[in-house]
Amino acid sequence: MSACRALRRPHSRRRSTVLAAGAALAALTLTACGSGNTSGGGGQTGFVQGAGGVDVVKDKGGRQSAPDLSGKTLDGKDLDVAEAYKGKIVVLNVWGSWCAPCRAEAKNLVAVANAYKDKGVEFVGLNTRDPDPAPALAFEKEFKVPYPSLYDSSGKLLLRFPKGSLNPQAIPSTVLIDRDGKIAARAIKPLGEDELREALDPLVAEK
């Protein structure tokens, strides 16, 4: 009898380990796509909650600089956001083709991108965790996305953001960068069209 118990214990331990690993992976997946968590970690970011769950930094002097966002786009072109869109307001959306809330949000981003193009506002995507560009390119074609996306499968560019400004596990996320290249607002959630317009209008009006 004791021999049977001895044989069962390793199997039981292995099963517990597998179950625990599976639960951890499921939790990470849920957090990574469509999480309502608005925490971006520690750090003094100056964000205050604004309308529609968009966090803003109203004091221009308290805004942090956006990181270097340069690399290859999904279609293989070089893009340096700071250089290409100098003096423009930039809406940076973090997304993945695998993310259902990103799909729901896409039409809102496309509508606002088209509406604000003549107001000095540029949109850029940051595609993450897609192991191959093909599904992401299909996503862009399906939703008629008019702006480029940097391809960041490993999350390297995402991790360059100042501590506390973004939660790398919360996808989709959106960051608004002012004309001086400073982080002015963020949303750690999918955005509606009206929410994005309300966040952009004060930046467009800034002198």
Residue ranges and their predicted role:
Residues 91-92, 123:
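Hydrophobic beta-strand anchors of alpha/beta hydrolase catalytic cores
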